[in-house]
Design a protein with these regions (language model features):
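Conserved, well-structured interaction surfaces
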Residues: 42-46, 50-56, 80-159, 180-187, ...
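Flexible, polar/acidic helix-loop-strand segments at domain edges
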Residues: 87-94, 325-395
């Protein structure tokens, strides 16, 4: 994987600034004295990216893992029903989470990301003249706005009714920050992207900067937000913006020919990658709370228990997020994405391998895309925390399918929509495959095949009003998680608990 962000942390001493960034924002003298140089702001920007990695923060708060087990594509799994109870409950919509039993790290890691992004946005314009070029300063600020939108996007999807602020809070401010309605949060996210991000970031970055936000990532993020909101007034606009990413060669996006290699290490940041979260196997961490980790701690969670591979490709893990039979059966038998996504335990055993079935919610299937592999971790620090697998957050195939959907929903060119849809289908099934006629229903099915176990399916079901049809026990009262009770208590009652809790 690319080590840019990790190496910046080493060069500029990110670990030395972590404690400072966790100090109360009321320490104005410290803040005023600290952010004086370009290196200081580089360090602050790296710190704002860092919560993207915090999958194990406060008892497993991975955006991707939680999203997968909330969907119909995965169970929770683990060793027993008591293994990580907050994850067990988020998968069971008939005995769902409570304000004191949920993956509350989703809240904390996201707001820490917001706080760190706000520091960059506030401090960059205050640097002494001549300290930093205007071009670089503006790029840093735009990146920080992108990150703030990303973190608020997660909070909006998971919690809905959230405190929203653009300047960090002092201890006395916590009771005055507005708690916005979901529609109000949506408007803020679009406004921030339109005014402060899109058009202000580079279209491409050099190899040593992979992991930093680009204009393509910002446009894709806007499209995801608009589609999740089902804002038909903006479908034509995002169709046009996505078309720019598809047709402008300056962005350098394209599908790679072979889907089967997409999740191999050497294809991180390939021409199909729009945005990834970088991880490294060389982080010297034993921090199970997650903040100091530079490796992807989700990977060990996803591995099949008791796995022994005679080919020494895969290694065992902890058996979380077992793939459901429903997902396995949804694929056409000859769709290569099925093999890339799923390890079929019967087939694995027939080839001489071993996998334990003595696990919680055993299904007979595990995820292959992010299964732990031999050589992808190291014994520096805690080996289980140090997997280098990047998360592919946005891929070019998503650009194509979002553009196709937006065209259909805005009355745009059906021919273009068919072309974009067909590119994704044919990459998987071959040029001779008879591609179905594009429709919203076919796009939604294709999204399941293309992005299975990438943290997308659940949100697609919710936004298309299909969650109740595919997820047992789901109804509209389950759209949002409860706000953690600890946060309600800290606010002295200012925060109002979400409806239905």
């Amino acid at each position: 994987m690319n080590k840019y962000i990790y190496l910046l942390a080493v060069v500029f001493g990110l670990s030395s600034c972590n404690d400072f960034l966790e100090l109360s924002p009321t320490n104005k003298v410290i803040e005023t004295d600290y952010y004086k140089t370009q290196e200081d702001l580089t360090e602050a920007l790296v710190a704002a990216y860092d919560p993207l990695k915090w999958n194990a923060y406060n008892a497993y708060s991975s955006y991707e893992l939680v999203s997968n087990i909330m969907s119909d594509d995965a169970e929770t799994g683990g060793s027993t029903v008591s293994d990580q109870p907050q994850l067990q409950r988020v998968n069971d919509f008939t005995n769902w989470v409570t304000p004191t039993n949920l993956p509350e790290g989703l809240w904390g890691r996201s707001y820490e990301g917001v706080n760190r992004a706000n520091i960059v946005i506030e401090k960059c314009p205050l640097l002494p003249e001549g300290t930093m070029s205007a071009e670089l300063r503006d790029r840093y600020v735009a990146e920080a706005h992108f990150l703030r939108v990303f973190y608020y996007f997660q909070l909006w999807r998971f919690f809905g009714y959230i405190p929203y602020y653009e300047t960090n809070l002092g201890l006395d401010d916590i009771t005055t920050v507005p708690q916005l309605q979901p529609d109000e949060v949506y408007a803020k996210l679009i406004e921030d992207l339109d005014n402060n991000v899109i058009g202000k970031l580079p279209k491409v970055v050099p190899a040593n900067e992979k992991g930093r936000a680009t204009n393509g990532a910002a446009i894709a993020m806007k499209a995801r937000i608009v589609l999740y909101q089902n804002d038909d007034t903006k479908m034509k606009e995002i169709a046009s913006q996505l078309k720019e990413l598809i047709t402008d060669p300056a962005y350098q996006y394209d599908l790679i020919p072979d889907y089967k290699v997409l999740f191999d290490d050497e294809y991180e940041w390939c021409k199909e990658s729009v945005f990834e979260v970088n991880y490294t196997e060389i982080g010297n961490s034993n921090d199970w709370a997650g903040k100091a980790n530079q490796g992807n701690s989700d990977i060990i969670m996803l591995g099949a228990r008791g796995l022994k591979d005679p080919n020494n490709v895969y290694v065992e893990g902890w058996g979380f997020a077992p793939v459901t039979k429903a997902l396995n059966d949804a694929f056409l038998p000859d769709d290569p994405r099925k093999w890339t996504t799923i390890i079929d335990h019967e087939e694995f055993r027939a080839e001489g391998g071993t996998i334990s079935s003595d696990v919680n919610q055993y299904t007979g299937y595990s995820v292959r895309k992010y299964h732990p592999r031999a050589g992808y971790s190291s014994t520096v620090g805690t080996e289980a925390l140090n997997y280098k697998n990047n998360y592919r957050v946005i891929r070019f195939s998503d650009i194509l399918l979002m553009a196709s959907e937006a065209l259909l929903r805005s009355g745009g060119s059906v021919g273009e929509a068919q072309d974009y849809y067909a590119r994704v289908v044919k990459r998987a099934m071959g040029d001779d495959y008879k591609v179905p006629t594009v429709s919203l229903d076919n796009i939604y099915k294709e999204r399941r095949y293309e992005f299975a176990m990438e943290g997308i399916r659940y949100w697609d079901l919710v936004r298309t009003n299909q969650a109740k049809d595919f997820i047992k026990g789901w109804d509209d009262t389950k759209k949002y998680l409860p706000i953690p009770q600890s946060e309600i208590d800290k606010s002295d009652g200012h925060l109002v608990q979400n409806p239905h809790f």
